[in-house]
């Protein structure tokens, strides 16, 4: 994976782990995503995924997830950011689900 992925390419992706790192998420999220603290991911020496696992991070607009994904790539993880974040996903008209569903 390169450093980022478009909303459309993510929607078509298989076998990728999607992580929501928004600090103040609304009640909706990208289907199949899981909520994690981005700052914890960036600082932790032990991560909840393997270095060869394909991971996409998303935040609200793409800024925080780009920075954190870059840090994790430098540490050897296969992590990219969703270009434009959750905002781009919604603007592309892609599905969202209520949290907890």
Q: PLM features: residue spans?
A:
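Rhodanese-like catalytic fold shared by cysteine-dependent sulfurtransferases
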Residues: 1-17, 21-54, 61-101
């Amino acid at each position: 994976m390169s450093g980022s992925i478009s909303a459309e390419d993510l929607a078509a992706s298989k076998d990728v782990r999607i992580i929501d790192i928004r600090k103040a998420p609304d009640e909706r999220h990208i289907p199949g995503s899981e909520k994690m603290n981005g700052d914890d991911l960036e600082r932790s020496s032990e991560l909840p995924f393997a270095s060869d696992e394909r991971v996409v991070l998303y935040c609200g607009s793409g800024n925080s997830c780009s920075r954190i994904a870059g840090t994790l790539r430098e540490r050897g993880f296969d992590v990219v950011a969703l270009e434009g974040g959750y905002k781009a996903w919604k603007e592309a008209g892609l599905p969202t689900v209520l949290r907890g569903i």
